[in-house]
Amino acid sequence: MIKKEFKAESKRLLDLMINSIYTHKEIFLRELISNSSDAIDKIYYKALTDESMIFNKEDYYIKITTDKENKMLIISDMGIGMTKEELEENLGVIAQSGSFTFKKENEIKDGFDIIGQFGVGFYSAFMVADSVTVISKALGSDQGYKWESIGAEGYTIEPYEKESVGTEIILKLKENTEDEKYEDYLEAYRLKTIIKKYSDFIRYPIKMDIETSKPKEGAEGEYEEIVEEQVVNSMVPMWRRNKNELTKEDYDLFYSEKHYGFDKPLKHIHISADGAVRYNAILFIPEKIPYDFYTKEYEKGLELYSSGVLIMNKCSDLLPDYFSFVKGMVDSEDLSLNISREMLQHDRQLKIIAKKIKEKIKSELELLLKNERERYEEFYDSFGRQIKYGVYSDFGQNKETLKDLLLFYSSKEKKMVTLDEYVGRMKEDQKYIYYASGDSIEKIDKMPQTELLAEQGYEILYFADDVDEFAIRVLVDYKEKEFKSVSSGDLGIEEKDEKEEQEEQTQGSKEVFAFMKEALSQKVKDVRPSKRLKNHPVCLATDGDVTIEMEKILSAMPNNQEIKAERVLEININHDVFKTLKEAFDNDQEKLKIYTNVLYNQALLIEGLTINDPVEFTNDICKLMS
């Protein structure tokens, strides 16, 4: 027996793999199981091309056994095995893949998948083991061999009597440290958890001897401990099954088992795609918003599998931010992985899959909106805010994709409507899509600024979410109809005779408004007669792009930029209050100053804004009452 050195920068490369390539030590088991699956696949492929061979899938499995006394973990398979030369070539050269060579030599193309494309997964065993022993007998060979190594120093190969074809890997686990309990890898529960997480859908049975209890024969009420062999993996991924054979209960159970949420999914989307990139996916739209959805702890992304082996728990690149609420998984045989099998080597395939998934989610939401309106509104109640974020984020580049998924409360319908529904029933001469912003539907419904539009039968969209107005500012228009706030200076509905009448009424009142503007100093841009008020005496309007509601939202942000709306105090000249203002202007201008401040503060309160000096406000009211 001669000790040999590794051929590929030995210590440096092995140290790099053990310490840098893999994120979690538990991944070693995934790699070794994947190698065992590859070995059985090779027998299957040979049987396809060799009529003298019979391959019965039920006869092949992978076995995990433990020896707690000697701290050994054994992974064995009934695969194709390795000759002495193959042991030296595949295990003696780091980054030499036997699966890759086999695939190349046999010209295996589409339709047959071998998981291992690199030759480094085996060496992940050294993350948890002081020494690794491989006992293997190749198909068609009379002699078995034993390969042993304690790490970067090298390895030995010697003949070994092995009865059956296949490979056995024996890991002598490391001693426990403060940071890692290596003996946990000898516990059945820990091993089953790792297998379920990463290798549940390996296509061959993974068997373990599990200790369990059963009623003792002839002794009522007594139990005895027995050890029985159990299959611990599912083998057949749900996403590869025929959709028509699956029920809603099947999908709900999968959602629960994968711990995607504590609720039930509102909708599932099952994709089986062939084309430039082949992939399967099962996606879920949750029924309720996750408790941590709007926190920094929330991670978006889908589980990513490569040929049934879990590669990433959360692949964020598969979902745009505006669909970050979607849960589920994607499995593809066409991904190019890096040597740790944990990350993508390049993302061309992933971008194709992500684009298709985005389009599918959108189309399914459109169908839900069209065919199951009530369920869509349930979804929108939970996740509509995220859709609106999607409209205005990234400089509006997604607004065309998302605009038809938006819903807003309608003053006329008293329910949620789409922009298309609103525009479809606009008056023939209507120039704008009207909206009103506020803290709640109830408060918006009472806004003085809506009086004129409501009286003339115009439909108003109510924006009660702080992101609404930002979204439509980015949207700009819908079907060539611009959005217009009910607080804007020009509502675009004034008739010529109305304009002449108002000008006539206000001719003798200009001095009153000028005095009031002076009294309010820098608080408002202007004081003017209102064209929109019918019953209320006063309201705030705005000139410019920033509305009162936008000012409130921006001022509440951490990086308060002191962005202010150009406030205009509007007075209803047909209200009795205006007569009082005119009388005060003619007879007691000090009282007019008090009236002006009271009306301005009243307008602030209606808008939900803070009064700068509440004490002065209450004193003014008392003065007027005394």
Swiss-Prot record:
Residue ranges, annotated region (B): 342-552
Keyword field: ATP-binding, Chaperone, Cytoplasm, Nucleotide-binding, Stress response
Listed GO MF terms: ATP binding; ATP hydrolysis activity; ATP-dependent protein folding chaperone; unfolded protein binding
PROSITE patterns per record: HSP90
Region (C): 553-626
Region feature A, mapped onto this chain: 1-341
Cell compartments where the protein resides: Cytoplasm
Sequence intervals crossing the membrane: none
Gene3D superfamilies: 3.30.230.80, 3.40.50.11260, Heat shock protein 90, C-terminal domain, Histidine kinase-like ATPase, C-terminal domain
Cellular compartments per GO CC: cytoplasm
Function of the molecule: Molecular chaperone. Has ATPase activity.
Family assignment from sequence similarity: Belongs to the heat shock protein 90 family.
Complexes and interactors: Homodimer.
Name of the molecule in the record: Chaperone protein HtpG
Gene that encodes it: htpG
